[in-house]
Amino acid sequence: MISRKEPFLPKKAPGWLAFLVCFGAVAADWPTYRADNSRSGVSTDPVPGVVSEAWVWHSQHPPRPAWQGEAKWDGWNKVFDMKARQTFDRAFHVVVSGNKAYFGSSADDKVYCLDTTTGRELWNFYTEGPVRLAPTVAEGRVYVGSDDGHVYCLDAQDGHPIWNVRAAPSDRRIPGNGRLISAWPVRSSVVIADGTAYATAGMFPSEGVHLLALDAVTGAERWRQVQTDLPAQGYLLASATRLYIPAGRDNPVVCDRATGKRIRVVDGNGGTYALLAGGDSLVFGPGKTGQLNALEDGPSDQLATFQGNQMIVAGDRSYLHSDTELSALDRGRYLQLARDRKSISRQQGEIQKALRKLDAVAGSDSEKAKLKSELAELGVKLDARTQSMEECLAWKIPCRWPLTLVLAGNTLAAGGQNEVAGIQASDGKILWTRPVEGAAYGIAASGGALFVSTDNGSIHCFRGTNQRASLKPPTTLESRTP
């Protein structure tokens, strides 16, 4: 179902402009969650060596996450102190286009627009359910999904609705998180690529989980696919040909972008954090124990695992972020060694299989001795590769900011409890720390400024200025409604 208000339909921009906006090529913008459809968390805009708080915006109510936390332990697998794997809505994550910052609220069901210079609220728009994931901005439009089961397209300038589509198959409502929500909430964000808006609706596989493609200008449905085995929760990712759908605590689903047909479910340990580290090379996690799984383009089995919460990939460097450490790796060398190690392990498995067959048929001792010798040689090679992988470390520092990590120019910005930090990417030197109100789960970088979102509903803006203004959302501003 599409509802439209044609007077607010802006003119269509050229296709090349959509590509630039959606994939983060416009240097000053951060138009979607973690900057681009790969969720890279990287901006080319540098941050000043010293920053000050320019303004802070306070919500009247803190975020209301859909999931309060992970179970304390997995008795069957004897895993204790499990990591939370569904943390996508613990803060109001900000996106930035031009001089405007946009975010959704899980507390009051609104989409907000702020002036990035002053923090003043410019407009807001009501949906009929919590808005748990950040909007996406493209071609002068703001796209966002809500727990009410709808995808909305708004005018980025004034918040007027352009169209809204019921992504859910019906308007059935159910109790959820103390609210009345759609039986098919939109909890995967909206991805814009090549004039198409992609979204999902549904988190109960037995009810059907819908993946759909819409015309980004008109909202017309292009295709719809339904899966009945996995949920859809977490930020969608898009490559040139594929869509990646985080599945909450389960492993991501890979689909064809042209048709929505499933390609595979990847192997791993689940979680809603995901990154495309070049092409279709996927990193995701954090699993039950805080592990990131790395898969290359094509194979479904793991290439490597890393102990960490998030990863930044920039050129030949990878920055790995864990609960206690931040480190930089020589990415190219590390991955080649990981490939070699994987190949050696595969050869070991084949030889061990051959030895078992010889044992079963009482094979000759000389043949067994030859295979055992080959196995020992492979063990030496494997140890050498493992040692070389450890030597790929460029630097490592203790880190008390484990909640989020982005890269702006040559500065890594990390969020922690009541504090954010700037770290020099080249050598790990801590440049500055600044206090914030609450746990800093979200950081956006644009135009030399950092926008930090916390779990108490605050949004802090830091830039190279001494200006400060503490702002509360105005109570008299007229709200837009569907």
Segments (PLM) and residue ranges:
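N-terminal secretory signal peptides that target proteins for export/translocation
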Residues: M1-K11
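Bacterial N-terminal signal peptides
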Residues: P14-G24
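Blade/loop signatures of beta-propeller domains
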Residues: D29-G75, V165-A167, H210, S373-R385, ...
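Repeat-blade elements of multi-bladed beta-propeller folds
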Residues: W30-R34, K83-V111, E128-Y152, R179-L212, ...
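Beta-propeller domains
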Residues: P48, W55-S59, S106-T117
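A short beta-strand motif characteristic of beta-propeller blades
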Residues: W55, K78-K83, R120-F125, W163, ...
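Surface-exposed acidic, glycine/proline-enriched linker/cap segments
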Residues: W67-A84, S170-S189, W223, T241, ...
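Short loop/turn segments that connect beta-strands within beta-propeller blades
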Residues: D115-T118, D155-D158, D215-T218, D256-T259, ...
